[in-house]
Amino acid sequence: MLEAPSFDKMLGMFYYATDTCPSGGVIKRSPEDFVVEEVLLDGTVIATSGVELRPRVGNWTWIHVVKRNVDTIKLVLRLARALGLSHRDVSVGGLKDTKAVTSQIISVRGPVANLPQLPGVQFLGMWSMDKPITPSQIYGNRFTIILRDVERISCAEGALEALKKTAAPNYYGYQRFGTIRPVTHLLGKALLKKDPHLFFEVMFCKIFSRESEVAKRAREAACKGDYAKALELFPKKFVEERVFLKRLAGGYDMWNAIMAIPPQILRVYIEAAQSYIFNRFLSIRMEIGPIDRPVEGDLVEINRQIAYYAEGLGGEVVLPVVGAGVRMPRGKVGEALLRVLREEGLDPSAFLKMPRGLRVYGTYRRVRLEPAGFEYKIMGNDVFMQFTLPRGSYATVLLREVVKPAEPHKHGF
């Protein structure tokens, strides 16, 4: 197995499936280079060009949204505010990449007469429905991607051919954690440990060279306790920082100031901590043996049921996404995973001890990532790719196998 660079290891991704040379290249040179189209369970593609859905009588409105360079959670909050609704009355089937052109369904409670004009957002259709859109109604996403300015085309082609034969590890990708500020999981760990001072330190005192000068100055001011100056400096797009600082400036204690941050954002932090631990689990499982073959103690998925592997049983290897209510593998796999939890100072029950709305249950995730309909084309120094991935899997994990970036942000990740 080829070892990953230090940045990847910081996010729990220790290995590559392919042993090809780094191709280099840049993703997301423009948002149009990274197109994501939601795919419903019945195979319907929510295409950027439009889609026809069959309406149903009910108290929900499904809206076809195409967004460009817009964060999904912030779009939900803006849409709820514009329609005079609670954010709980607006739902999505999944978060989509921000720096991209993405097409998906957003549902809102009740009828909608007029939709607002929002920068970077197009509304292409509306249908009355009997239920909200939820992750369980989504199969996955179709990706159309251009990797530009590839430095070593032969390396790219070698990796792409290898990925036709070899599954990639189903890591959670870079965008789950951040590449300019890779701290989302650290904020989540601070929340799970109920350590508000650590949360503050990570948010404001951990400053990265890749950040803008304005953001650096704002964080420095906040870290020194000058909340008013930090609020002046932070642009409005820094929603969570500004909410936190306003409450601190207003005399709130630190924990209650954190709890004023929109719950959707806090939940992202907690889920990022889950993702980091899963990545560490998967890296350890790769050390134990090939991930396409179960070993004693493994958990496997058979007909959507989770069971302990037994000789001749077959099944697809899964690992727990740690949280309340999940089983751990047995034997040397289970022992290694429990060691990770001890090192991180986390207990699965911590996910259930969070305030209401932030409680996260555990689940299981397949360890192998195999794209459907995978095709690519070399165009000079660019590579065009199209494929479909199941819900929760990351296109950037496949692209990582091709580019093998030491500093992901320099390659558009």
Curated annotation (Swiss-Prot):
Its EC number is 5.4.99.27. GO terms for biological process: pseudouridine synthesis; tRNA pseudouridine synthesis. It is an enzyme of class 5 (isomerase). Signal peptide: none annotated. PROSITE patterns: TRUD, UPF0024. Residues 167-370 form the TRUD domain. The active site is at residue 97. GO terms for molecular function: pseudouridine synthase activity; RNA binding; tRNA pseudouridine(13) synthase activity. It catalyses: uridine(13) in tRNA = pseudouridine(13) in tRNA. Keywords: Isomerase, tRNA processing. SUPFAM superfamilies: Pseudouridine synthase. Could be responsible for synthesis of pseudouridine from uracil-13 in transfer RNAs. Belongs to the pseudouridine synthase TruD family. This is Probable tRNA pseudouridine synthase D. It comes from Pyrobaculum aerophilum (strain ATCC 51768 / DSM 7523 / JCM 9630 / CIP 104966 / NBRC 100827 / IM2). The lineage of its organism: Archaea, Thermoproteota, Thermoprotei, Thermoproteales, Thermoproteaceae.
